[in-house]
Amino acid sequence: MDSRAALHHVTLSLAGRVVLHDVTFAPVAGELVALCGPNGAGKTTLLRALAGLLPGCDRPDPRRVAYVPQGARSAWGLTVAQIVALGRIPHADAAQAPVERAMETCGIASLRDARVDRISGGEARRAMLARAFATEPDVLLLDEPTADLDPAAAHDVMRLLRRTAENGRAVVAVSHAIELAIQYAHRVVVLAGGRILADLPADRALPAAATAFGMRAGADPAPRLLPR
């Protein structure tokens, strides 16, 4: 079991179909990396491979690497604090300080006693992120963390992820929203057909992303950018 997540020249087949082609990728501390590309590009597959959840992929230390799948919602009868405390399971302890820090970081400390099924979608997403933060990982792997959120909530989540990276963690997030990726990520990795087409600083990633999505390269991808 490796302590961190990394892929080195990985080719992966599932159900007889090659889903990753010679992929090399490693998260970097201090960076928010957005994985972008059209449906079926291999974004979630790459993320799950990093998390060691696919056959033949090394499983990183769960105390060091936290994975949040798309739409992660579990144990809805629990309170926010109880959900976040589940993040301590990999450490086999019930330490409360990391739980409190995670709720403060994610801006949900005031909701600690609220049931997760009775708060907004954005607040519930923050509770799932806080559960991952409570693990105190070095690497955060997030599949579509802004999916189904309204624009303001999506920007809030991306700001939080960028701050988290700039505080020294490695953060990797799958995103269909090119505008959010370009505005908040430090790097954008563009995938298509299970291959990495480009790995670029965010402010240089639009042409490659446009190619992958079949967009017109000069199109404005970000009509609703908000201040960071």
Task: Label each PLM-derived region with a short phrase.
Residues 115-119, 123:
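Conserved ABC ATPase signature
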Residues 96-111:
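Conserved ABC ATPase "signature" region
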